[in-house]
């Protein structure tokens, strides 16, 4: 009875929601036009940046050293910290920002890549009549619209499908999604809609067909998170903020307030991580925007302060692009343990995640095999049984730490806030914590408002609504065509440059090397499967990239797309960076080692490679073992029991295939488990066993050897009696 009432109530609410949405559609269209006009007006009110290009890191450090006192010093170069710096500097405040690692090196680069209002939070707001959750959704939807407007090259609307497997869920979820559209109002990207079972399968052919009723499609935003964070920091630098990465805060400076006699935070002792040099940076106001490390800085101010951050780890995996449609994501609203899983196309790959597990705060979070397998199992539940979801198809994996917080001023100290908290300590340290990527701008605005009030700073109102981020102002969807026409770039590379750098893509194109081919004329790729080119390494240094890890993970996104491809590109990236930054051989070796450790531990290479180790079980039929042994011995002509690069080169030359030595080294290195420069028979059999089981998606060596064997077999001499007679 209760169930029937619930369903009837849902349908009644659905009817009301439909009438309301239809009735307000014309009004929403009118309001959207007004909002667009407001964006134009806001952009016109903001003065041009002080610098056409961001100053060099060396120039920024000199500014930090030589400025007697800043108005605001921001600690933390993630999305929120960079947003605070941009908000402060565009209000006319003398602003500095320091980050102990690279911009976006923490949580801000390890997100689900969505700019969303939070459908789940709206559900909680309605079910629990929670006004705070409603306000959070309303704010996030406004910020979503703003972010899509100010960085159109880095973001775009994305349709997300919600498959429905029980008939009563259709009106239930439809009402919820329509309310999501309604709350968005003039900020609604596109109206949600219902799909029949057949239409849903047209869009997503791999979807589980059994018991599928239909689907609901709604719209949220998607972005390139690390590049977005970098664009915010670079925009702040262009407007005059002294921003420096690899600048660690060692301690907070304090001085006695002559009026109250109390100690006040007055700056920070900073250390250049790259040189070891230490110096003081003084400021009227210090802002702690360090995400998961919030309490570390708070304890520098007061060692007895109560911790407010409750870190939670969210793991994501990347799979080949064929696992999802190119232009539509999928949402599993209720996993086996009550979590939500997204399945999204991104950069021609597929992202699946996330988990939500309590964790310790660390600079180097590692994705666990347990979390990776949990996500794979949830993916299997939603895909057709005809599709084999294999562990070996995980191309990269990462863990990001969410800085969930409790409000120190709240009576309920155990209640975790999904919203942000701005706290001012007795000594004047301002802490901004919590929140989410989408609302970084409003979080920054709230923080600077609090700073202006608490420290009597002379500043204008916030000017960041409608303020274009670097690369966004003169971007257009057809900009890539000019890159192809003017510079002779491949279309795929040109599209990538336009979507990564916006109107700054022309500067990257100018740096591109000549290929020596008829086409493309310029743009030498770092790895053949991805559109990243060597010129991006040189340009990345202008964007404050200081290490090889910066380049493979945040200037390019190779590490987040395919760890093996990133590892292959590393030697060339280090060589190019070494030329620009005058690295000696020792420094180059150090960079290679550090970057490989990063890929191995933090980006899932460890989990991926552990699927094939020296202890891997060889589970092959005797006939298979025999076949693979014969293939192996065609290369090991001297019966040594192993093959080297020379053996492979000899066989390839005999069938007329040319391959450069560096590529061959990379191919052998994938299978050389004990790293002795030789691939032994047992290593090769382990590889073939792992490929058959689906633990490893494939191997270039395995494909190469099979192709060579087939070509060699074709060259067997024809018997005389079958040669049409006669010699």
From Swiss-Prot:
Record carries keyword Repeat: yes
Binding site for Ca(2+): 672, 674, 676, 678, 683
Binding site for FAD: 71-99
Pathway the protein contributes to: Polyol metabolism; glycerol degradation via glycerol kinase pathway; glycerone phosphate from sn-glycerol 3-phosphate (aerobic route): step 1/1
Record's keyword terms, sorted: Calcium, FAD, Flavoprotein, Metal-binding, Mitochondrion, Oxidoreductase, Phosphoprotein, Repeat, Transit peptide
Domain EF-hand: 623-658, 659-694
GO biological process: camera-type eye development; gluconeogenesis; glycerol catabolic process; glycerol-3-phosphate metabolic process; glycerol-3-phosphate shuttle; multicellular organism growth
GO molecular function: calcium ion binding; glycerol-3-phosphate dehydrogenase (quinone) activity
Extent of the transit peptide: 1-42
Activity: how regulated: Calcium-binding enhance the activity of the enzyme.
Primary location group: mitochondrion
Matching Pfam families: DAO, DAO_C, EF-hand_7
Cofactor requirements of the protein: FAD
Localisation: Mitochondrion
Source organism superkingdom: Eukaryota
Catalysed conversion reaction: a quinone + sn-glycerol 3-phosphate = dihydroxyacetone phosphate + a quinol
Any single GO CC term annotated in Swiss-Prot or TrEMBL for this entry: mitochondrion
Keyword Acyltransferase appears in the UniProt entry: no
Positions of modified residues (Phosphotyrosine): 601
Protein EC: 1.1.5.3
Family, as annotated: Belongs to the FAD-dependent glycerol-3-phosphate dehydrogenase family.
Purpose of the protein: Calcium-responsive mitochondrial glycerol-3-phosphate dehydrogenase which seems to be a key component of the pancreatic beta-cell glucose-sensing device.
Protein name, per record: Glycerol-3-phosphate dehydrogenase, mitochondrial
Organism: Bos taurus (Bovine)
Lineage: Eukaryota, Metazoa, Chordata, Craniata, Vertebrata
């Amino acid at each position: 009875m209760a169930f029937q009432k619930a369903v009837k109530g849902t349908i009644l609410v659905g009817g009301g929601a439909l009438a309301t949405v239809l009735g307000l559609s014309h009004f929403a269209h009118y309001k959207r036009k007004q909002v667009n006009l407001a964006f134009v007006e806001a952009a016109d009110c903001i003065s041009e940046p002080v610098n056409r290009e961001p100053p060099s890191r060396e120039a920024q450090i000199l500014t930090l050293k030589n400025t007697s006192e800043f108005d605001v010093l921001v600690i933390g170069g993630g999305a929120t910290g960079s947003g605070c710096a941009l908000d402060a500097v565009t209000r006319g405040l003398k602003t500095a920002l320091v980050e102990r690692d690279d911009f976006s090196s923490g949580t801000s680069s390890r997100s689900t890549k969505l700019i969303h209002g939070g459908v789940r939070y709206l559900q909680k707001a309605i079910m629990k009549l929670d006004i705070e959750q409603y306000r959070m959704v309303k704010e996030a939807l406004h910020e979503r619209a703003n972010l899509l407007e100010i960085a159109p090259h880095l973001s775009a609307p994305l349709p997300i499908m919600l498959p429905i497997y029980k008939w009563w869920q259709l009106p239930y979820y439809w009402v919820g999604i329509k309310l999501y559209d309604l709350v968005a109002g003039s900020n609604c990207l596109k109206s949600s809609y219902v799909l029949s079972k057949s239409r849903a399968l047209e869009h997503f052919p791999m979807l589980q067909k059994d018991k599928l009723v239909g689907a609901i499609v709604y719209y949220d935003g998607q972005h390139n998170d690390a590049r977005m964070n970098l664009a915010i920091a670079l925009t702040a630098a262009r407007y005059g903020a002294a921003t420096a990465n690899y600048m660690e805060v060692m301690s907070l400076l304090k001085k006695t307030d002559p009026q109250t006699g109390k100690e006040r935070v007055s700056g920070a002792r900073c250390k250049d991580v790259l040189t070891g040099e230490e110096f003081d940076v003084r400021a009227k106001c210090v802002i702690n925007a360090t995400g998961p490390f919030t309490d570390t800085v708070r304890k520098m101010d007061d060692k007895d302060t109560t911790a407010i951050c409750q870190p939670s780890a969210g793991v994501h995996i990347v799979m080949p692009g064929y696992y999802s449609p190119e232009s539509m994501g999928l949402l599993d609203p209720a996993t086996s343990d009550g979590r939500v899983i997204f399945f999204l196309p991104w950069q021609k790959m597929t992202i699946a995640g996330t988990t939500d597990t309590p964790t310790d705060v660390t600079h180097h979070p590692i994705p666990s095999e347990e979390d990776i397998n949990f996500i794979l199992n949830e993916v299997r539940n939603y895909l057709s049984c005809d599709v084999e979801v294999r562990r070996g198809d995980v191309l990269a994996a990462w863990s990001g730490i969410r800085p969930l917080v409790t409000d120190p001023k709240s009576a309920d100290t155990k209640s975790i806030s999904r919203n942000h908290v701005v706290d001012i300590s007795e000594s004047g340290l301002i802490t901004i914590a919590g929140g989410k990527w989408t609302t970084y701008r409003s979080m920054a605005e709230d923080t600077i408002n609090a700073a202006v009030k608490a420290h009597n700073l002379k500043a204008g109102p916030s000017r960041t609504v409608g303020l274009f981020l670097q690369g966004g102002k003169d971007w257009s969807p057809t900009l890539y065509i000019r890159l192809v026409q003017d510079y002779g770039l491949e279309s795929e590379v040109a599209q990538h440059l336009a979507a990564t750098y916006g109107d700054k893509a022309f500067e990257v194109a100018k740096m591109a090397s000549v290929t020596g081919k008829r086409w493309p004329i310029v743009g030498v790729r770092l790895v053949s499967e991805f559109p990243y080119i060597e010129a991006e390494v040189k340009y990345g240094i202008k964007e404050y990239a200081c290490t090889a890890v910066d380049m493979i993970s945040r200037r390019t996104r190779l590490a987040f797309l395919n760890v093996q491809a990133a590892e292959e590109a590393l030697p060339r990236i280090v060589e190019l960076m070494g030329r620009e930054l005058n690295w000696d051989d020792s420094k180059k070796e150090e960079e290679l080692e550090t970057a490989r450790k990063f890929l191995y531990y933090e980006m899932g290479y460890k989990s991926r490679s552990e699927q094939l180790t020296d202890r891997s079980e060889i589970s092959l039929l005797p006939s298979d073992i025999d076949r693979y042994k014969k293939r192996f011995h065609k290369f090991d002509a001297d019966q040594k029991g192993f093959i080297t690069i020379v053996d492979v080169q000899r066989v390839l030359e005999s069938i007329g295939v040319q391959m450069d030595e560096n590529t061959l080294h990379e191919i052998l290195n994938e299978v050389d488990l004990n790293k002795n420069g030789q691939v032994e028979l047992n290593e090769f059999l382990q590889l073939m066993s792992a490929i058959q089981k689906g633990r490893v998606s494939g191997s270039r060596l395995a494909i190469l050897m099979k192709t060579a064997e087939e070509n060699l077999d074709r060259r067997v001499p024809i018997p005389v009696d079958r040669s049409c007679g006669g010699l």
